[in-house]
């Protein structure tokens, strides 16, 4: 053994060839934390000191190669002054450069995922051989930063600036065949041939058949582009990427600027340029929010995994109520491998559900994400039925009938008598109390809520609602099934609107107040889209459906009359009464035409102004900042109340619910992190400025206490 640490070992394989193996003890994956970086330095020194070493193969003892840097360390690291961040990055890069400068050839054997720092380690090697099952990429832009271990320097010099810009600015993972095509790897082999492939390359380099020094040299030099080529490559890329990423996500464009700025430098000077830009991005609020989201997502996954221990295995599912929603649920279950019965009382509804599932599967085939054989397999896993004949072996039933408590209670009571005693019943409801629905059941302990968001195949969140009598097994089994369906489940306790809709309706309430104050809804949409929402509130209400919004608002007003009941007619009332129901009937706040792809396209319709005129009670001058605050303050305060009321257990779950469920701007991190970014005391003072708008704008006593004590939601 040449070197042995807790994350890295170096041992002889054969005739001067050594293996530098990453295998971080006590962890399921390899990652670059402080320990691993320090051991890499020591391992490189040990290799340098051993004159018998003729070549080095870099490998992994895990199923993955290296997933990247340890993101949990980012939080503390990024609090350091910018100069210290730059110095720390340069120190880390000296380790990678020392490996790259070894006087012997090096080969990286990529057995699994190599992302971020994992790929950057491979780029420092002379040759790369990749398993057909592996993926590589530099996803740092998704965290608001860019590669900091030499990725912006080595990758462009290896695969060309155009390819490197695409890889780095998109943050995408790349399959083996694509990596080989652009020259990111030198060979692709079957998993079982990986070590043999690496040995073959290293032996050919040692023998002189391959000139490893010539292979290494371009990575040490400036980019081979003249001034005109640079301008054409980088200016075009910056314009395109800026349009794709938008103004709220600076990292992709900054990465291109860094590659451009370092293009005329050799490796070491180029690494200094990278380190300076990396440190600047690391200090932005966008990076703080996106890293926070990543860590929140990891917490969600840990919490969901904790349910596995007591969850029953779902081998057969059923959905009650076909149509678009039922078809979407059936599709999601079947495509992820769980066969499902789809029951309705009407043949035409069954056909609608099957058509929806078939359409979604067909779309995946068209995009190359599914083979026709797999599509047929998934369709065969959806069994339509008009009766309960096959329900005896069902493990979970998702009820997705009309949003009416009496209908749901009747259907749930009926199906309870048709399934085995330990089968779980789950209601896909967005507003109706789970405790109320449970009253119709003989076994309420087996009943939970399972709120899917529309469209089911696109929205990642599922709210699993725990009723007063729901057992932990019922909750755990539903969480496990949601995970199996490829969703991100969050467990919440029962209340009107649960988490997401309870928070969304105060946001709509702020919007209603603005329209009633004479503010143009088109202007409101533009301001909120610029703030970062995927669509403005008027457009969102049209997509949801004015009738759905009208019903939901009434449910919320009944549940929280002190702050959500408004005696005055609102814009939603006016549109509902005028039968302007949104996209579903072609007119709501906007009118809708069909575009070339057959999708609804919104256009302004002057007729709506006459519909809205009776509900405009004043003409108030408001700034764009006022518009944001009228809407965001009540949303944030309701999120705080959900946390304080125990509807959601943690701040992380609350924020992720909003990002996954309603498209809260990810670069702002969620409602509670948004409060943190303003400062709790400053947010309370801001809310107090709008106190005259009503109780939705009044901070809770506990939040005032947090402000007084200088506390935050995230430390």
Swiss-Prot record:
Protein's organism: Pseudomonas putida
UniProt-listed InterPro entries: 3-OHacyl-CoA_DH_CS, 3-OHacyl-CoA_DH_NAD-bd, 3HC_DH_C, 6-PGluconate_DH-like_C_sf, ClpP/crotonase-like_dom_sf, Enoyl-CoA_hyd/isom_CS, Enoyl-CoA_hydra/iso, FA_oxidation_alpha_subunit
Transferase is among the record's keywords: no
Family matches, as CDD domains: crotonase-like (cd06558)
Gene3D superfamilies membership: 1.10.1040.50, 2-enoyl-CoA Hydratase, Chain A, domain 1 (3.90.226.10), NAD(P)-binding Rossmann-like Domain (3.40.50.720)
Annotated stretches, region: 3-hydroxyacyl-CoA dehydrogenase: 312-715
SUPFAM superfamilies: 6-phosphogluconate dehydrogenase C-terminal domain-like, ClpP/crotonase, NAD(P)-binding Rossmann-fold domains
Functional description taken from the UniProt entry: Involved in the aerobic and anaerobic degradation of long-chain fatty acids via beta-oxidation cycle. Catalyzes the formation of 3-oxoacyl-CoA from enoyl-CoA via L-3-hydroxyacyl-CoA. It can also use D-3-hydroxyacyl-CoA and cis-3-enoyl-CoA as substrate.
Cellular component, GO annotation: fatty acid beta-oxidation multienzyme complex
Gene: fadB
EC code(s) of this entry: 4.2.1.17, 5.1.2.3, 5.3.3.8, 1.1.1.35
Subunit and interaction comment: Heterotetramer of two alpha chains (FadB) and two beta chains (FadA).
GO biological process: fatty acid beta-oxidation
Entry similarity comment: In the N-terminal section; belongs to the enoyl-CoA hydratase/isomerase family. In the C-terminal section; belongs to the 3-hydroxyacyl-CoA dehydrogenase family.
Protein name stated in the entry: Fatty acid oxidation complex subunit alpha
Record's keyword terms, sorted: Fatty acid metabolism, Isomerase, Lipid degradation, Lipid metabolism, Lyase, Multifunctional enzyme, NAD, Oxidoreductase
Keyword Nucleus: no
Catalysis: reaction(s): a (3S)-3-hydroxyacyl-CoA + NAD(+) = a 3-oxoacyl-CoA + NADH + H(+); a (3S)-3-hydroxyacyl-CoA = a (2E)-enoyl-CoA + H2O; a 4-saturated-(3S)-3-hydroxyacyl-CoA = a (3E)-enoyl-CoA + H2O; (3S)-3-hydroxybutanoyl-CoA = (3R)-3-hydroxybutanoyl-CoA
């Amino acid at each position: 053994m040449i070197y042995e640490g807790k994350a890295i070992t170096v041992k002889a394989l054969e005739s001067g060839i050594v293996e530098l193996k990453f295998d971080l003890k006590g962890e399921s994956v390899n990652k670059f934390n402080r320990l691993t970086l320090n051991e890499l330095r020591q391992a490189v020194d040990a290799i340098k000191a051993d004159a018998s070493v003729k070549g080095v193969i870099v490998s992994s003892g895990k199923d993955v190669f290296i997933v990247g840097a340890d993101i949990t360390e980012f939080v503390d690291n990024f609090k350091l002054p910018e100069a210290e961040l730059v110095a720390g990055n340069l120190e880390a890069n000296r380790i990678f450069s020392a490996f790259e400068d070894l006087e012997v050839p090096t080969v990286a054997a990529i057995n699994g995922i190599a992302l971020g720092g994992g790929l950057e380690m491979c780029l420092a090697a002379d040759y790369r051989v990749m398993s057909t099952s592996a993926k590589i990429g530099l996803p740092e832009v998704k965290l608001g930063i860019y590669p900091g271990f030499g990725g912006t320097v080595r990758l462009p010099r290896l695969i060309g600036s155009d390819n490197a810009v695409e890889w780095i600015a998109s943050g995408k993972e790349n399959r083996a065949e694509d990596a080989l095509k652009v020259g990111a790897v030198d060979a692709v082999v079957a998993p079982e041939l990986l070590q043999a492939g690496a040995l073959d390359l290293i032996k050919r380099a040692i023998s002189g058949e391959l000139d490893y020094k010539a292979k290494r040299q371009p990575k040490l030099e400036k980019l081979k582009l003249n001034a005109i080529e640079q301008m054409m490559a980088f200016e075009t890329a910056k314009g395109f990427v800026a349009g794709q990423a938008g103004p709220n996500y600076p990292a992709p464009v900054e990465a291109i600027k860094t590659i451009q700025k370092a293009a005329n430098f050799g490796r070491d000077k180029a690494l200094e340029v990278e380190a300076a830009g990396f440190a600047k991005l690391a200090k932005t609020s966008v990076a703080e929010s996106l890293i926070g989201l990543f860590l929140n997502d990891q917490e969600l996954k840990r919490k969901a995994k904790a349910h596995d221990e007591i969850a029953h295995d779902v081998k057969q599912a059923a959905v009650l109520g076909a149509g678009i929603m039922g078809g979407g649920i059936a599709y999601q279950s079947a495509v992820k491998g769980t066969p499902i019965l789809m029951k309705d009382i009407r043949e035409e509804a069954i056909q609608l559900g099957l058509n929806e599932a078939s359409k979604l599967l067909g779309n995946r085939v068209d995009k190359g994400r599914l083979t026709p054989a797999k599509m047929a397999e998934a369709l065969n896993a959806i069994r339509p039925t008009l009766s309960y004949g096959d329900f005896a072996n069902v493990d979970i039933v998702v009820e997705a009938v009309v949003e009416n408590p009496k209908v749901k209670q009747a259907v749930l009571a009926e199906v309870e008598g048709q399934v085995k005693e330990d089968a779980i019943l789950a209601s896909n409801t967005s507003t109706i109390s789970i405790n109320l629905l449970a009253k119709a059941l003989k076994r309420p302990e087996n009943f939970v809520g399972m709120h899917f968001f529309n469209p089911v195949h696109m929205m990642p969140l599922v709210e699993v609602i725990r009723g007063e009598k729901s057992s932990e097994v019922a909750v755990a089994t539903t969480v496990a099934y949601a995970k199996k369906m490829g969703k991100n489940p969050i467990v919440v306790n029962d209340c009107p609107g649960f988490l997401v809709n309870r928070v969304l309706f105060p946001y709509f309430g702020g919007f209603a107040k603005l329209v009633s104050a004479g503010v143009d809804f088109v202007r409101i949409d533009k301001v909120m889209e610029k703030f970062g929402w995927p669509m403005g509130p008027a457009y969102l209400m049209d997509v949801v459906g004015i009738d759905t919004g009208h019903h939901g608002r009434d449910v919320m007003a009944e549940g929280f009359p002190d702050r959500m009941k408004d005696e005055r007619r609102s814009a939603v009332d006016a549109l509902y009464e005028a039968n302007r129901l949104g996209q579903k009937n072609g007119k709501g706040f906007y009118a809708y035409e069909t575009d070339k792809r057959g999708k609804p396209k919104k256009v302004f319709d002057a007729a709506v102004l006459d519909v809205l005129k009776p509900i405009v009670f004043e003409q108030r001058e408001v700034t764009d900042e006022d518009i944001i605050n009228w809407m965001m303050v009540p949303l944030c305060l309701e999120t705080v109340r959900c946390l304080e009321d125990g509807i959601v257990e943690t701040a992380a779950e609350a924020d992720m619910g909003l990002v996954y469920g309603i498209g809260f701007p990810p670069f702002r991190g969620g409602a509670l992190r948004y409060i943190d970014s303003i400062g709790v005391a400053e947010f309370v003072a801001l809310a107090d400025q709008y106190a005259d708008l009503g109780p939705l704008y009044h901070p809770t006593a506990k939040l005032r206490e947090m402000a007084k004590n200088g506390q935050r939601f995230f430390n």
